[in-house]
Design a protein with these regions (language model features):
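Conserved short strand/loop->alpha-helix "switch" segment adjacent to the catalytic nucleotide/phosphoryl-transfer site
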Residues: 57, 61-88
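A short beta-loop-alpha structural element at the N-terminal edge
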Residues: 49-55, 59
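Short, well-structured hydrophobic secondary-structure segments
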Residues: 86, 91-96
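Conserved beta-strand-loop-beta-strand hairpin that lines the nucleotide-binding pocket
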Residues: 1-51, 95-169
Length: 169
């Protein structure tokens, strides 16, 4: 594997069968890593209606402010960066590829943040990029799958919801 390739250490469907080790994202995957599943229950903390990727710097700043000021305990800086990265990747994917109205919501459980983004592309499940050089981008969904303790997607009321659960501590 090239040294700059990103490797997922989760089971994945590969051409030729199931791999317990993971996959090499330069093009060997034959199936999605985002299961169709409902998220766990969580209380709403923040919500945004988004229309353009130019809004994402403000959204990231609001999330950082909330997590450092309003959260009941100090958050590890690395976990905070991972939370912000997940929201940014999921929202930018929805804005670029999803169409229709896009919403982003961050919810809280006692030990995690639930990031949930919706768009109107109900027939387009989250599909990590395959068959391309990692330097061309498209690794956001792989990265979020690795950072999260759970992740999935579902369709409800004419919208697709993509979600990831990220630890708070």
């Amino acid at each position: 594997m090239p040294p700059d390739a990103y490797e997922i250490v989760r089971p994945a469907i590969l051409l030729g069968g199931l791999s317990a080790r993971g996959l090499h994202v330069t093009g060997q995957t034959a199936g999605p890593i985002w299961p169709s599943a409902s998220p766990p229950e969580a209380a709403i903390a923040l919500h945004w209606e988004l229309g353009d990727v130019a809004e994402l710097p403000r959204v990231r700043a609001e999330l950082r402010r909330h997590a450092t000021r309003d959260d009941p305990g100090p958050m590890d800086p690395d976990l905070l960066d991972q939370l912000i990265l997940a929201l940014d990747e999921m929202a930018s994917n929805a804005l670029r590829h999803g169409g229709g109205s896009v919403t982003a919501t961050v919810r809280q459980t006692p030990d995690a943040y639930l990031v949930e983004v919706s768009d109107a592309a109900i027939h387009a499940p989250p599909s990590p990029a395959v068959g391309r050089d990692p330097s061309e981008g498209g690794l956001g969904l792989y990265l979020i799958a690795e950072l999260s303790t759970q992740h999935g997607w579902y369709v409800s009321n004419g919208h697709k919801f993509v979600w990831a659960l990220l630890p708070r501590a």
